[in-house]
């Protein structure tokens, strides 16, 4: 049962990009809907818990949530540039590299020689995996430009996701205490990021995208439980498995086309990212 709970984040976060893509809408509509869904879920959690708030917890969690919106909105943009099956392994790999480097240099993780060797070996595998998943066999000017745009977009996205994780870690804020102020930060930032655009912000797709927002929040809550049930290392490692669902789902359910060579390299790349993520989880323990 503990492992089942620990797998919920991977399932929720793996399916979420597929649901967002199926619902459709522009990135601004997707980020607003997703953050509204996360806020609704956070309010429900707040009612049944007793979080302890201080000014630091509220402000830092709010800013952390704003960084998440920066990360998520740019991930949505990358879906339109390179597709879900390329975006998710690239995004996951970049996030793992970013959060791990912060962990080493800011929080002095991997405190032994063996953990440093394991951790940096993991980063090497992840970087190789990133390159493999981004491979294009038949390049034309348009696809090449889209890939460049996608990588730049995902670098910005990763800054947002890393900031989201690092801020609460820096101030040693419990995930339970952070949930509501984080969600408020997500909504405010999502609304601000979506101001400069001609498309309507509130459409049918906006409200439907509350569903993946609830899915993301469910995965986040399950991760808090799984960290207690199976430990941070195992919980973290299992949560990375969602990239398999989103990558394969992008190909099978969203119809994203790959040549045979691209498909093989994507699978190898995803496996390397997962192995690297698992190794990082072990190094954290």
UniProtKB/Swiss-Prot annotation:
Belongs to the GRP transporter (TC 2.A.7.5) family. SUPFAM superfamilies: Multidrug resistance efflux transporter EmrE. The chain crosses the membrane at residues 5-24, 31-48, 53-71, 84-106, 116-135, 151-173, 178-195, 207-226, 232-254, 263-282. It is a multi-pass membrane protein. InterPro entries: Sugar_transport. Pfam families: Sugar_transport. It comes from Listeria monocytogenes serovar 1/2a (strain ATCC BAA-679 / EGD-e). One of its GO terms (molecular function) is carbohydrate transmembrane transporter activity. The keyword Cell membrane applies. This is Putative sugar uptake protein lmo0169. Keywords: Cell membrane, Membrane, Sugar transport, Transmembrane, Transmembrane helix, Transport. PANTHER family: TRANSMEMBRANE PROTEIN 144. It is found in: Cell membrane. GO terms for cellular component: plasma membrane.
